[in-house]
């Protein structure tokens, strides 16, 4: 099914399922699974963009690495990272893969021809995305790079060192997501499986939702990029840091589906089981779309097809006797009930199409109203023919007899057969077709076995049968005219289907054998897909050998098929390549096979047509068209390839084989040399990562578990961070509500949750007294802890004051705000989230939790964000949760020797050598002994000086001054500096400069900014607009005349030769690089590329010579900063543009101890340009050199220009009057060490031939664990890379920041106890 369409439908029907990831407000996860093919496509090419030159391949690799790192940092898995690349797929999937690849190649070819016809530039070389197919040299190279990347991360990144990493590459058979599900399915069958394992699966396919649901693990989320529609999907930043991600919570989707089918609790005549309803839901979704079978005609997700399936399911299941999907096996008799109801729907589609044809002469798209059909159609029989009345009376007599069955001829009309099926369904009878020994075909009706057989159930069943018989007794007979009309309708209906089969598959509806074979193949396909999802691939060779599905009513003809799949084996990589690639992608297959794709004498040349038909088949989007190409004959393909096998090289033979997945882990006492996967770019590694083949646990004597695991936590008792509606008392219903998720109100129904006010009997004052000054949980249903600082009703404010609550009257302005706040909250929750909670009597003002903070003694205490005060209706807060979040658990200080064992990495917070790397070697008398990387004095102020000097030369003028300077109308200036759209027929053309964006609250760095008085523009803007005016004076004469006029047309602006003049304007704007200018939020303070270039030039001159470390004794714990402590200490730092910083985490994309300069400041993040390049570095949207930039959280770096955590040392005092040469120790022990001991070996220098020798940071003080590789494997010459990046800071720097303006924390312990924190806002700490 279409991904955007399904996501939109689901988001509007179940509006709280998806959660935007903001900061770290997500659950903790044990396992992260990456469906890698989506990442590969994202990082190698743009969708449908054939005009851009391809990226260099090394940039693709780095983009892939960055994407993996970015997702890892978002989720931070605790136990497992599983990366799965698509391997050779089952034949059933190859049909779709083959169609997509043929279409991709044809689209690229057509785009080139179109560009040539229009005289447009087109790149000579293009990236063929078809290379992302198992067996290509590109995929082999990607695997090699990923192996290197994993070794690098496990060796250097602390967050990768305590987990298991599994990589399943293109040489492991199976689709990526199904390899992942096989892993989960097998693990779940093991006795040691934790039923509360927390899963996160990244991927773009809609079927991942189904795979997640069928796991029946409630602690399961899907991670995906933001889905945008319309203009919002364009003009995005290229920086990965700016990409929004969503979590789709299957815990909430499960509960939404429980709401969806809640009426079934009272209507089912068998045991209600949500897990089995979820299994049925998965099967129903297959009818709307899947990757293995064409969709049934007329069922479209965006038109309400799933809602229709739900409606039919609720209607027929009460009499079904059980569920349709029985642990992955289809109950055909129960599926038949669904298909019978769908047959009535198909007739309505037919009538709508006939009506549309008569009215408009166009039957391509039936004007059928799904919603009206679902809500108004009862499908009750309005009248019966004489024959049908006779059949009814015979069955009525049969019910009162003691006969076990009754038979009818199988030759009765299809209309009468449908009547009998419907009657049997209503009477809970079984309807089937049989063949007697003599070959006679009969329709047999028998009593259906019931799940319950007690007397009460028998009595209920009998009462229902009596009601049905009474209803049919009262159905009138059709008169002759009506009967004739019905026959004609049926005749036209058959002809409609006959036209379909003749045009789509080349045989007639009346060819019963061919139609039955097609229907049986489709039903066989449904079972194959269900097996594939629940048990894994049950046949590698099976596939659906038609381009189209049968009509819905004809699927019934295939329900008697005998299912018998033969497992077979997967295609080898080259067989898959030759099966799915078009001739236009022949360069991707081994040379010896290419002739088979293009030579007219090739025995399989018919597999590779250059031209082929596309059939929209009722779909609207061009990419949804059916590609009409031949199916692959497996035997012919393999025979043809066998004749060429002898010409394969040894490397190609290796690439044509299968391998097992690989598992990676850290070995503490192991080091090995790992050669570069790309010597021109990456250095060799000294790795501590070991790899070995991975195999799944044995399933011998075990069965796959379908359903909930024993011991799983559900609902309000689920694992922390996994949302549930059950934390508050509520009800839910499916109604038309006009939910607005994507900017427009939905016309489809949504599940609306109505929260009950359990405190309605209390006054607002009583409720306030219960909550104010307490900790509660807000953001229902996701929940996060918060501190209630105050509360307000329409008359009073209630505030926490020491140990009491103060009540005061509202000021007049507060009274006026009360009504607006309440109405805004009610509307927001109602229209965006589908939550109703009645009127608001009390609003709580809360400060959300910010995290944990370290005290000076090393304890952890909660802090609440003092810069954020949020309003929440009292009805939507939760007082307690079942499981506390371990991420916010306070703790006492551990002993020094426990928290700082030998070998611990840290950063020094002493006055001298502030921010320099250090390493713990021991502990004595509750004080630490460290090796400290000292550095000579260096000015840490140069960044600020450079920025201030550059900004002093950058003049900005109010817009009215600029208008005067340019001698144009102020309104014209506003238009021309914005997006200025003029009409060109049905299109809109932009002749504006896009230098300001009011609606988006964005400015363009170096060109515009907005003050409290309005927009201001720089000299650059003045010069650019002046050039625009001088280049097109006639245009501006016209625009000046019409400065106040809206809705200008191209003809208005260019009266003569409008097409050529418009093209000239657009070309000029393009040549000026307007679209490449950097847009940022108005709130963001950032530097443009010109200033950043000066910063990079200055940084390149800094001496980064490695310094001999000094041994320092008597260092207190609060004079050191461990990487694991950064969030709890550095969260309130202040920064200014130009500040010098050092990266102080031992995980993430930036090398530890890397120095850089702040070039952008946001609320929670900084843009930093680092002195030396590193593998994951970016260009910060084109503002800095490649591999230098990165957006980091404020707590990831230590500000060394403005030191805010300085600890005074005795050595620091002594140094002011008696400065030693190079060996001054710091701390209370003044013993000096002139050189390191033998336990501090000099780390190895990477090979000099690597470009990364000049780019990658090499933090020497943190390389104690490394052992040099064999001398013969190391390149002899040294490189710049081996110098590292440990720039020293100014030893006499005296600036002391107060910290806290970014949100001074509100601490816990009743929030009034004072702690002696390591952060001393009024000055330095004194070491005694």
Curated annotation (Swiss-Prot):
Cofactor(s) demanded: Mg(2+)
Region described as Disordered: 1211-1328
Classification via Pfam families: SH3_12, XRN1_D1, XRN1_D2_D3, XRN_M, XRN_N
Principal location listed in the UniProt entry: cytoplasm
UniProt key word Repeat: no
Transmembrane segment boundaries: none
Compositionally biased residues, Polar residues: 1217-1231
Family, similarity comment: Belongs to the 5'-3' exonuclease family.
Protein name per Swiss-Prot or TrEMBL: 5'-3' exoribonuclease 1
Protein source organism: Schizosaccharomyces pombe (strain 972 / ATCC 24843) (Fission yeast)
Taxonomic lineage: Eukaryota, Fungi, Dikarya, Ascomycota, Taphrinomycotina
